[in-house]
Amino acid sequence: MKYRESILNFIKQSKRVLRVSKKPSREEYLNVSKVTGIGIIIIGVIGFIISIIAQLLGG
């Protein structure tokens, strides 16, 4: 019984979250995409710099 109750509780909470959430506007979606892209580029550049430094120091 406890397993069934936990599943029903999860479904109930999921419905509530879906009811409250909304679809992002085009502008919001583009802003999130830009920020995510910039973050990926920054992480890539940092990794590239670290690999260059490691090659220079390690030989």
From Swiss-Prot:
Chain ranges passing through the membrane: 37-57
Record flagged with keyword Disulfide bond: no
Gene Ontology process terms (BP): intracellular protein transmembrane transport; protein secretion; protein targeting
Keywords of this entry: Cell membrane, Membrane, Protein transport, Translocation, Transmembrane, Transmembrane helix, Transport
Gene Ontology CC, one term: plasma membrane
MF-aspect GO terms: protein transmembrane transporter activity
Complex and partners: Component of the Sec protein translocase complex. Heterotrimer consisting of SecY (alpha), SecG (beta) and SecE (gamma) subunits. The heterotrimers can form oligomers, although 1 heterotrimer is thought to be able to translocate proteins. Interacts with the ribosome. May interact with SecDF, and other proteins may be involved.
Descriptive protein name: Protein translocase subunit SecE
Species lineage: Archaea, Methanobacteriati, Methanobacteriota, Methanomada group, Methanobacteria
